[in-house]
Amino acid sequence: MRLPTRLKAFLFASLSLVVALTLSFGVAEGIVRLKNASMRDYNTEMWRYGRELKLPSADPRLGHEHIANSHAVLQSVNIRTNNWGLRGGPVSDAPAPGTRRILMLGSSIALGWGVDEDKVVSSFLEKKFEADGQHVEVLNGGVGNYNAERYVERFLTRLAPLQPTDLLILAFVRDGEELTRDSGNILLRNSQLALTAWVAATRVMAKASDGLVEHYKRVYAPGSPSLALMQAELGKLAKYAREHDIRVTLAMVPDVHVDLTRYPLGFVHEVFAQAARDNGFAYVDLLPAFQGLRPEDIWAMPGDPHPNARGHALMADAIYGVLAQAREAKGTR
């Protein structure tokens, strides 16, 4: 049976359109990937981080975890994980007798996104202890896109067997935000072109929404669900630390993509300072270490407001004195 001429024309036109769109998408995808091969696009490199070094967690509270014993070159920096999913080389399951072991918790800033392994806070601290004649292990437990709930639960359920003598929380203003697991649709998981379009749309919507300060005022408002969850998680961590004789230091990292000379998020720092007081943690506000610096002085690269190696060195300088005093006051176990 022969198809009517009009139907044949319609089917041919539809098929031609599908082929043309597919070819156009393929060409555009290739152009975007070629452009991003320089590893200078922050959003694309974060997307690759999620694909190459993360996997969904069986624990919904964690959302995702690092793939153990893996590595990837992201933003022109090699990031490797050991069998615990920590950034860096192999570590023993437990510290040697009498050895101080500091485990750093946090998100991508603690991880050292965009910074070589030997120039992140954990590495600088180890070198400082060594220069003072002390053998101290500083382990890097940072994971990108983690909040307080995620890094506390990861420690309690995954990393506690490492038996740290100290915990160093490298906290950030986003740590009180509630996060949900979102693996994205098939296009966002596999297409850099789709990612680029999604980022552009997100930026347009962000400009139309409330500003950054108003957002964080809602997150940290007294009685807000997000604040209550963060406080509960830090309280849970404090209880475990007391029961296991672990010293905890909370170092508050400022948001370095805003004006540091007229820093508008001091109220968030006070929330974390109060949480530290409530839980018996030592507290270090890292804002003074960054004041007077311009974004281009401390950003990992243009468009990426993570602290660079200089920023990590400044943070380590500010934190080291507190950690050294903690040892003198209590000694190692």
Predicted regions and their residues:
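N-terminal Lys/Arg-rich, disordered targeting/topogenic segments
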Residues: 1-9
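Serine-dependent acyl-ester chemistry module
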Residues: 8, 169-274, 281, 286-297, ...
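Hydrophobic membrane-insertion alpha-helices, especially the h-region
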Residues: 12-29
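Membrane/wall-proximal cationic-aromatic binding patches
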Residues: 36-128, 290-294, 302
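Conserved SGNH/GDSL esterase-like catalytic core that processes O-acyl groups on lipids
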Residues: 72-74, 78, 92-97, 101-103, ...
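Short, amphipathic alpha-helical "lid/cap" segments that border enzyme active or binding sites
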Residues: 148, 152, 227, 231, ...
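Histidine-centered active-site loop/cap adjacent to the catalytic His
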Residues: 282, 302-333
